[in-house]
A protein has these predicted regions:
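Short adenine-binding "F-helix/F-box" segment of the Bergerat
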Residues: 1, 35, 158
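ABC-family ATPase nucleotide-binding domain "signature/switch" substructure
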Residues: 5-14, 22-25, 39-45, 59-156
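DNA transaction DNA-binding modules
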Residues: 15-19, 32-35
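A short, conserved alpha-helical patch in the ABC ATPase nucleotide-binding domain
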Residues: 26, 30-31
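Conserved H-loop
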Residues: 48-55
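C-terminal boundary and immediately downstream tail of ABC-type ATPase nucleotide-binding domains
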Residues: 156-179
Length: 179
């Protein structure tokens, strides 16, 4: 069972952080992961800059549950944690909820790096996080109503996914115009 668990990483919308350094929260106190390993991985997925800007950088001490960090910053730490574990299976459960658009772009970049050559299950309301998925399964009221690639689903006349996509991206365009 331990071997199976070591092959799966989970990134959820509710990230738990220990009252300890960013480094220890990323490595989960694994003595086999060095600061150089962490920095290299952070650079690979594009989040080194955010961590380096914190007072003390990787040794910045967070309070329990990360109360001094934004939701997006906690998500980025969780992504780096998952990336370092190099799982065979990655589960992202609403990993981009409660974040701003700048952090979402960072997370999308990190996601593209993390999911390479892995089985990935992405549970999302933000369709921007799943556009490049091989297969999208669309649920409505707990029932599967459509499945396929983004291109296939967007071309279904009166499709549920197509309606969601149009609503979501129309809203994003309106927000962009207001800002």
């Amino acid at each position: 069972m331990k071997n199976l668990r070591s092959q799966i990483s989970l990134v959820t919308q509710d990230i738990f952080l220990f009252a300890d350094s960013i480094f220890n929260n990323i490595t989960l106190f694994n003595p086999n992961i060095s600061i150089d390993d962490v920095k290299k991985a952070a650079k690979e997925i594009g989040i080194h800059g955010f961590i380096n800007k914190l007072p003390g950088g990787y040794y910045y001490n967070v309070r329990e549950r990360g109360v001094m960090l934004s939701e997006g910053q906690k998500q980025l730490i969780s992504f780096l944690r998952a990336y370092l574990s190099n799982p065979r299976i990655l589960i992202l459960d609403e990993a981009t909820s409660s974040i701003d658009s700048k952090t979402e772009k960072l997370i999308q970049y990190a996601t593209s790096k993390i999911i390479q050559n892995k089985t990935s299950i992405i549970i999302a309301h933000r369709l921007s996080t799943i556009l490049n998925s091989d297969k999208i399964i669309v649920l409505e009221n707990g029932e599967i109503v459509e499945s396929g690639s983004h291109e296939q689903l967007i071309n279904i006349e009166d499709g549920f996914y197509k309606k969601l996509y149009e609503l979501q991206f129309q809203k994003d365009e309106l927000i962009g115009e207001v800002i």
